[in-house]
Amino acid sequence: MTNDTQRPSGRQANQLRDVRITRHYTKHAEGSVLVEFGDTKVICTASIAESVPSFLRDRGQGWLTAEYGMLPRATHTRSDREAARGKQTGRTQEIQRLIGRALRSVFDLEKLGARTLHIDCDVIQADGGTRTASITGAFVAAHDAVAKLLATGRIESSPITDYVAAISVGVYDGLPVLDLDYDEDSQCDTDMNVVMTGAGGFVEIQGTAEGVAFSRDEMNALLDLASDGINTLIAKQKAALEQKSE
């Protein structure tokens, strides 16, 4: 695909931002990652609790849940902490539920045993795509947490059934483009977030037109872009997980 339109970043239409996945970013959590999609930076941690929610008690399976938040100055202007306001926004609740659903799609929760894997995604700098970066980084953090369960003999086999990652796509200046940054996201005609597994299955597709409806052909082009982008992200996840721990 050629760069037939001028993206604010100068990237090709099918070009991801620079993606970095840094494991063992903090020392206390069983799994921790700094994930960077260009200037979007998210700390993802995975913590193990030897208990399950009440609705799963005595059912012999585990649970995975996620929380998401942004530092007050992660964006251009400071926002109040949600804890100070005493209430999470609808956006925050939507995103953390999405992260949880995405990761649960590749977990056999019975193999996890009667324990909970808590995923925390904290955005330290936002430039578009925070939810997709969170999912991509959180999977690696969860993988490291599971590795510790295996290493200590607390589980016999991995509950992880596949990889999962996410990316944004959109129609910008009439052209389908991959991995929207803030400037593109705020000006695009269509914005879509796509979550996929390593096997190529779709976990979630969130698509919205902004003023101009998109066609079936445009949707197919966006999904093709997303699929290629997610394949690249999963390759980066695998490369990060192959690196030896210090």
Curated annotation (Swiss-Prot):
SS bond partners: none
Positions of phosphate binding: 91, 129-131
SUPFAM superfamilies: Ribonuclease PH domain 2-like, Ribosomal protein S5 domain 2-like
A GO MF term: tRNA binding
UniProt-listed GO biological process terms: rRNA catabolic process; rRNA processing; tRNA processing
Enzymatic reactions: tRNA(n+1) + phosphate = tRNA(n) + a ribonucleoside 5'-diphosphate
Protein keywords: Nucleotidyltransferase, RNA-binding, rRNA processing, Transferase, tRNA processing, tRNA-binding
Subunit structure: Homohexameric ring arranged as a trimer of dimers.
Function per UniProt: Phosphorolytic 3'-5' exoribonuclease that plays an important role in tRNA 3'-end maturation. Removes nucleotide residues following the 3'-CCA terminus of tRNAs; can also add nucleotides to the ends of RNA molecules by using nucleoside diphosphates as substrates, but this may not be physiologically important. Probably plays a role in initiation of 16S rRNA degradation (leading to ribosome degradation) during starvation.
Recorded family membership: Belongs to the RNase PH family.
Protein name: Ribonuclease PH
